[in-house]
Amino acid sequence: MKAYLFIFIFLFLLNFLILFFVLKTELIVSSLIAGGYALFVSAFTSYVYTKKVEKLLGVLLYFAEFVYENRQNLEGSVFYSPLYEELRDIVSYIEGGIKNVKSSLEKQLADVHVEYTEVVEKLGQIMEVVERLKQGEIEYGALPTGLDPAGALGEILRESLSEIAKKIDNIKRKIYELDDTIKKVKNYAEAGEEELVKAEITRTKSILEEIEKELEFFK
């Protein structure tokens, strides 16, 4: 709480001095704008760092949806409006791909490589979206000019997106493990190694469960 209070006081004083002495804004107006901005940033900082990481993507999706639906009213702001649709579609596709992998495994192991290849491609797409966000594609142009909000908010957003990137990389590694176990099942089956086939099938199912558990982060 002390850290957030310090952030509030620091930002208030900094922005008040800029508005009042540099931009020659009236005293009351300078106080209101500086106070509002400082309150927004400190509250946003508190929110990001006290929420569980598992809720982060849901917050981003909600924020993207809000901005997309109200983009006509946000004059002067720049926001990547298709972001919400991309994230939702990609996460849904990954979940569907995992279900298809499980179904294919039960029917015919030879077809599974097609499913996980498509899932890896989609993971690449969502990584591109995360990288665009980390590089500052979102600008808060609707806020008062001269306050440079992208510095404080952008840093918080980049740190949060790094956690998402780690999760995605972990899922990709598990999918490659799935590839290896499926190849082993095929080779052992051709060699007539029944016990080894059973062991690798058990391992394959375990990897699928691990991937599904990782995907809970994005719900």
Curated annotation (Swiss-Prot):
Subcellular locations according to the entry: Membrane
Ranges in a coiled coil: 155-218
The keyword Membrane is assigned to this record: yes
Keywords: Coiled coil, Membrane, Transmembrane, Transmembrane helix
TM region(s), chain numbering: 28-50
Assigned GO CC terms: membrane
Membrane topology: Single-pass membrane protein
Name used for this protein in its record: Uncharacterized protein aq_1849
